[in-house]
Amino acid sequence: MDVIKISPRGYCYGVVDAMVIAKNASLDKSLPRPIYILGMIVHNKHVTDAFEEEGIFTLDGSNRLDILKQVDKGTVIFTAHGVSPEVRRIAEEKGLVAIDATCPDVTKTHNLILEMKEKGYHVIYIGKKGHPEPEGAVGVAPEIVHLVETEEDVKNLDIQSEKLIVTNQTTMSQWDVHDIMELVKEKYPHVEYHQEICLATQVRQEAVSEQAKKADLTIVVGDPKSNNSNRLAQVSEEIAGTKAYRIGDLSELKLEWLKGVNTVAVTAGASTPTPITKEVIRFLEQFDHEDPSTWTTEHNIPLKKILPKVKAKN
């Protein structure tokens, strides 16, 4: 089968940095144990499973404050998605060692919100409800940040302020953000724009929007909780016009999707381990509709191959 390996795809620098920070923590014998990650360090189950083998445990829950209630001692790692100042304060009050793996692009948004608060602004924040990144951003200044996800959310806004700015979650579809921003502009003509789609997300979406047009089908390799992975599938269908499926790894690929398909495009979310994506590509390249011996969708990547290699500190 012909395979279009969409480029760029896969890991972004924020994800790699977060994983290296957590991996270094696992090797640092001076850190108090146990070591916990507040939520998924990045949204990929293969990564969290690999860290568990390294002795770092992922705690999950509805929000970061609830997760933090589960921890009474040891070390906590804040994920790439960022956390609110309240989470940081409570971790300190509990006497926990805190390690910050927040993506620099997310930190930039937090700093923008703080700056706008000091200037007397209200902030309309476009993001996915229930996702940890908006949770942290809203938590920076909950009294002035208004989270919107849908057209209905914009209609329900009631902000009485001449100082108003609109920004967004870094991993949203740039087309979705544009549409919501236009609705906000209609309602509040005086609003200022500050689009925060991170460059890695933007170039991956643009690559899919162009390169997937040449394919009969797009496979996005990414975790179901990965917002940027889900958005890549959306971009393939809505912008490139190519049917797309998201899979966590090769074992989730269904052969019936490949019926009548001659060319398939493959991309991966920013939190998807490269070996997982390569395994999918290898399978598709050798796949033959007429040869059942090429039809086995068995995932065989060991967890020890998932995490980046770092040197132990002396």
Swiss-Prot record:
Biological processes, Gene Ontology terms: dimethylallyl diphosphate biosynthetic process; isopentenyl diphosphate biosynthetic process, methylerythritol 4-phosphate pathway; terpenoid biosynthetic process
GO cellular component: cytosol
Involved pathway(s): Isoprenoid biosynthesis; dimethylallyl diphosphate biosynthesis; dimethylallyl diphosphate from (2E)-4-hydroxy-3-methylbutenyl diphosphate: step 1/1; Isoprenoid biosynthesis; isopentenyl diphosphate biosynthesis via DXP pathway; isopentenyl diphosphate from 1-deoxy-D-xylulose 5-phosphate: step 6/6
Binding site for dimethylallyl diphosphate: 43, 81, 131, 226, 228, 271
Protein residues bound to [4Fe-4S] cluster: 12, 103, 198
UniProt xrefs under Gene3D superfamilies: 3.40.50.11270, 4-hydroxy-3-methylbut-2-enyl diphosphate reductase, catalytic domain
Positions contributing to isopentenyl diphosphate binding: 43, 81, 131, 226, 228, 271
Class of enzymatic activity (EC top level): oxidoreductase
EC number: 1.17.7.4
Keyword entries, A-Z: 4Fe-4S, Iron, Iron-sulfur, Isoprene biosynthesis, Metal-binding, Oxidoreductase
Cofactor binding notes: Binds 1 [4Fe-4S] cluster per subunit.
Keyword Transmembrane helix carried by entry: no
Pfam families linked: LYTB (PF02401)
Substrates-to-products reaction catalysed: isopentenyl diphosphate + 2 oxidized [2Fe-2S]-[ferredoxin] + H2O = (2E)-4-hydroxy-3-methylbut-2-enyl diphosphate + 2 reduced [2Fe-2S]-[ferredoxin] + 2 H(+); dimethylallyl diphosphate + 2 oxidized [2Fe-2S]-[ferredoxin] + H2O = (2E)-4-hydroxy-3-methylbut-2-enyl diphosphate + 2 reduced [2Fe-2S]-[ferredoxin] + 2 H(+)
GO terms assigned for molecular function: 4 iron, 4 sulfur cluster binding; 4-hydroxy-3-methylbut-2-enyl diphosphate reductase activity; metal ion binding
InterPro entries (alphabetical): LytB/IspH (IPR003451)
Function: Catalyzes the conversion of 1-hydroxy-2-methyl-2-(E)-butenyl 4-diphosphate (HMBPP) into a mixture of isopentenyl diphosphate (IPP) and dimethylallyl diphosphate (DMAPP). Acts in the terminal step of the DOXP/MEP pathway for isoprenoid precursor biosynthesis.
Assigned protein family: Belongs to the IspH family.
UniProt xrefs under PANTHER family: 4-HYDROXY-3-METHYLBUT-2-ENYL DIPHOSPHATE REDUCTASE
NCBIfam families in alphabetical order: ispH_lytB, PRK01045.1-1
Name the record gives this protein: 4-hydroxy-3-methylbut-2-enyl diphosphate reductase
Native species: Bacillus subtilis (strain 168)
Gene that produces this protein: ispH
